[in-house]
Design a protein with these regions (language model features):
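Hydrophobic packing positions in regular secondary-structure scaffolds
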Residues: 1-261
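Alpha-helical transmembrane segments and their membrane-interface boundaries
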Residues: 142, 250-389
Length: 389
């Protein structure tokens, strides 16, 4: 079902048929279609959705669509959405909304929720605390497997994940973790204390999100606990949230490799002046660097004038040099981004790149010398000069 078919059903007022079709679709696909519609049509279709599906669709809307819908919703509709949204999705929503919409949302929240929201909004934007959720399954080590399973069945539907459960003491200090798989296959009378893993890998609330992403990549976790400085469990970060972080970091890496200032805004949502500002600084630097190159070439004007054929090889030499530089910088920047290369490795990298460039340079020189002698038919001293350059 695409946007045109949906608009056709709306024009023909076949609302029941449209509702049945939407109920069978994935929430991500519905959100993508509604994002492209005008507000009136999107709101009409959104109100057709079953309540549970509507909440899931809302979580996948673009920030602009979420803002417009919140403005258009009744207080009752907004209250339901906020009650059903996972807490981390609500925080993401609030961080992107203007003050008037934030105030409208806070008015619909309980005093306890407002306290939690204010606490989350105080975390630095790129920290673990800013992307964690408080919806996790919490167990005590004195519980039996039977009691733990009953607790999961009672509270699991409102949690972000139940695959990993977190064991805390009465002060909420993290003591261990246990997977649902272990609970399912263990004896019902066994104690959580005897089954849990007490060597827990965790991150702290103020850790950078790149550090958190590295933990997920290294250990292949579905979720990672987040603790404060007193080792109290404050939340968890799930793999779906860290995937967004990885995508953002990868985008920034590509922008840096292309000599652009990183941008948090998607390309289609960025203004012309903002994009120009990101590019102009590095382009000016490259232009000035090219000016120095021009002066160097000018200083050899007499040589080039006496051996004019050398001029025709300048583009080849510059393009080859530029390409080799791009290859090296791409690999090194990617290594820095993934944590494979660290600052202490700078001399190792320089030594390795020197040996690589020496090997590649010799190979190119031999091939180029043969090409110039056999195809271009130039004199041997010119072939040697160009090849060694």
């Amino acid at each position: 079902m695409d946007e045109l078919n949906i608009l056709e059903l709306i024009e023909e007022k076949k609302y029941l048929q449209l509702k049945r079709i939407l109920e069978e679709m994935n929430e991500v696909d519905i959100a993508e279609i509604l994002d492209d519609l005008d507000l009136h049509t999107a709101l009409l279709i959104f109100r057709m959705l079953p309540k549970d599906l509507a909440v899931e669709v809302f979580a996948h809307f673009s920030i602009e669509q979420q803002r417009d819908l919140v403005n258009a919703m009744t207080d009752k509709e907004l209250n339901f959405i906020l009650d059903e949204l996972f807490f981390d999705d609500m925080i993401d929503l609030l961080e992107e909304m203007p003050a008037n919409i934030v105030n409208k949302i806070l008015m619909q929240s309980s005093s306890e929720e407002r306290k939690l929201i204010n606490q989350f909004l105080k975390y630095p934007p790129d920290s673990a605390g800013s992307i964690m959720t408080i919806e996790y399954v919490e167990l005590k080590k004195t519980m039996t497997v039977r009691e733990a399973m009953a607790h999961i069945k009672e509270t699991g539907l409102s949690k972000e994940t139940v695959y990993t459960c977190y064991v805390t003491d009465r002060n909420r200090k993290l003591e261990g973790i246990i997977s649902l798989r272990i609970l399912v296959v263990s004896d019902e009378n066994a104690l959580i204390e005897d089954l849990m893993e007490d060597e827990v890998i965790f991150v702290e609330t103020h850790d950078d999100q790149e550090t958190v992403a590295a933990v997920f990549v290294r250990y292949g976790f579905l979720a990672v606990p987040v603790v404060d400085k007193e080792h109290r469990l404050t939340g968890i970060i799930t793999v779906d949230d860290i995937m967004d972080v990885m995508e953002q970091e990868a985008t920034e890496d590509f922008q840096r490799m292309a000599a652009m200032a990183p941008s948090e805004e998607p390309y289609m949502d960025s203004g012309v002046f903002a994009l120009a500002k990101q590019r102009i600084v590095w382009l000016l630097i490259l232009m000035i660097a090219a000016t120095f190159t021009g002066h160097i070439i000018t200083s050899f004007e007499n040589v080039l004038g006496s051996v004019v054929i050398l001029t025709s090889f300048i583009p080849m030499l510059m393009n080859t040099g530029g390409s080799s530089g791009s290859q090296a910088s791409t690999l090194v920047i990617r290594g820095l981004a993934t944590g494979e290369i660290e600052l202490k490795d700078v001399f190792k990298v320089i030594w390795k790149e020197f040996r690589i460039s020496l090997l590649v340079g010799i190979t190119l020189a031999i091939v180029n010398f043969g090409r110039l002698m056999s195809i271009e038919k130039v004199e041997i001293h010119i072939a040697l000069t160009v090849s060694l350059t």
